């Protein structure tokens, strides 16, 4: 068995005047390969510790949190990569509901604002709308986003303007539909982003690329949207 020390952000609005950091030592028996496994062990010791989790396999995005100063998924973070004390905090830039749980309302408001669905006014075919292999390949690196919010909550522009700046996750998905050969609303989507804040608050800091658990590149997608904006104004 190995003893590990966790420093966890704690805040219960029903009883705490302000947040605080709690230090907990726990014996791990070697079966806790991932951070989420260790968190489940911690919760068995102290049931009041609150965090989101679901699939355990990096698909749902529920257990995103700030791990030793960097956003990531607890279920994909190997305990062997975490040296010394493990500091866990909620995703930055969003209101804290309790402990490691944040209010995702603003994040999903911005995501929904880009109309994350195909817009095609032609008569629907009996089966699927076909794409060539080349057209389908254009969506690689775009559709895999799991909406964990690690990228947007690592972005200073989103911290400062969460009500105005769409954020890396939303803009990645905006380009996912702009790039889709089956979608017919490119002009409408670009019009929706024609604003000093919604798109152009991205200053290519690239924190989003650094933290994405799926290895996606929101900055590249945002750059392509900016390029399209420029080209249509020429």
Question: Locations of the language-model features?
Answer:
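Short structural boundary motif marking the start of a folded domain
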Residues: 1-6
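Short polar catalytic/cofactor-binding loops
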Residues: 8-14
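Short, contiguous acidic and Ser/Thr-rich linear segments
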Residues: 22-33
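Short strand-turn-strand beta-turns centered on an Asx-Gly dipeptide
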Residues: 27, 66-70
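Ferredoxin-type iron-sulfur electron-transfer modules in oxidoreductases and energy-metabolism complexes
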Residues: 32-46, 89-234
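Active-site phosphate-binding and catalytic loops of NTP-dependent enzymes
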Residues: 46-52
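Short, structured protein-protein interaction patches enriched in aromatics and acidic/basic residues
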Residues: 55-64
């Amino acid at each position: 068995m190995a003893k590990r020390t966790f420093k966890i952000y704690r805040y219960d609005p029903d009883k705490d005047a302000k947040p605080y950091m709690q230090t907990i030592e726990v014996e791990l028996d070697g079966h806790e390969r991932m951070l989420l496994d260790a968190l489940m062990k911690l919760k068995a010791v102290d049931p009041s510790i609150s965090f989101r989790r679901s699939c355990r396999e990096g698909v749902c995005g529920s257990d995103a949190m700030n791990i030793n100063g960097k956003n990531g998924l607890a279920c994909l973070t190997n305990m062997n990569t975490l040296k010394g004390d493990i500091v866990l905090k909620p995703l930055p830039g969003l209101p804290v509901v309790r402990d490691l749980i944040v209010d995702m309302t603003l994040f999903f408001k911005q995501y929904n604002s880009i109309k994350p669905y195909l817009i095609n006014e032609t008569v629907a075919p009996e089966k699927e709308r076909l794409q060539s292999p080349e057209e389908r390949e254009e969506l690689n690196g775009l559709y895999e986003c799991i909406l964990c919010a690690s990228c947007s909550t690592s972005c200073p522009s989103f911290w400062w303007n969460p009500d105005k700046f769409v954020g890396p996750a939303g803009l990645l998905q905006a380009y996912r539909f702009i790039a889709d050969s089956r979608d017919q609303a490119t002009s409408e989507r670009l019009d929706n982003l024609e604003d000093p804040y919604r798109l152009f608050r991205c200053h290519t800091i690239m924190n989003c690329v650094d933290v994405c658990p799926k290895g996606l590149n929101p900055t590249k997608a945002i750059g392509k949207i900016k390029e399209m904006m420029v080209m249509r104004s020429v």
